[in-house]
Amino acid sequence: MPNMSSGDDKNFDLEERTAVFGEKVIDFAKAVPRNEVTKPLISQIVRSGTSVGANYGEADDAISSKDFRNKLATCKKEARETKHWCRMIVRAAPEMRELAKPIWQDAKELHLIFSAILRKTSPPK
């Protein structure tokens, strides 16, 4: 689905970015050679990579600031987990290294974005 953002809505931009990230993860997973080692890794990276956008959508519709932070924390965890599965896939299929780099980089950037949002929205201690 194309980006339907007017360009002014930053939340929608992150929603679109997380959706595109999930699409990239799916495309990457489809390119990984299938064998007994990579099959479970592929399933894991698809789960974590597509979960980022789904959980961000949930955060965007949160009913409270606590709910928002909890959903964003899940986004952060799933982005970090996607980096892990990316690394494991490259270990199992070294020929995937170049295709994995942008996925790993996007996951790292999303992890940092969610970390920053969580820091800014956490109540003072």
What are these regions (language model features)?
Residues 1-125:
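Short, C-terminally biased terminal segments at protein or domain edges
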